[in-house]
Amino acid sequence: MIRLLRVAVWSLGAALLAGCSGLKTYPDTSPKNLFVKTEASSGSAFARVRVAVHIHQVDANCRAEYLGTVQLNEPSVEIGIPVDRLSFLEFSFFSSSFLGGSSGTIHYTTLLRPRAGHTYDATARYAEGIYHVVIRESDPRQRAGREIERRGLDECGRRA
């Protein structure tokens, strides 16, 4: 009985902490068109790196509304981003050290307006404090794709 009570209290505490973080799971209901490959290495056995992508929809007035987060815990993750609508993607690389007690977050942000019939291949890499994100657009009817130019939220009125 006491063990069951401990498990219930621990589960409730974990749920409360998760709820207090302000992060919610992205409601991934669109057809999968963003394929993210993640490579993250801290370079140390005493440190850890976590990678996530926070997805926002952008309205006609260039205001971003947070929709949710996808944790990039697997080497490859498929996400559905609505087509023909401007989205703001925020890749976050969170590093923490067990011995030094230090931590930090690096962000890579860009606007993306997925086109119908196209796929988007993203690579999110982090190694020894250096991050790199590349997003490529591919049209299955054409051989060559193109790299998506990084654009900030302040550029949302400009079509890419």
Cite the ranges covered by each PLM segment.
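Short loop/turn and low-complexity linker motifs enriched in small/turn-promoting residues
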Residues: 20-114, 118-160
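Sec-dependent bacterial lipoprotein signal peptides
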Residues: 1-22
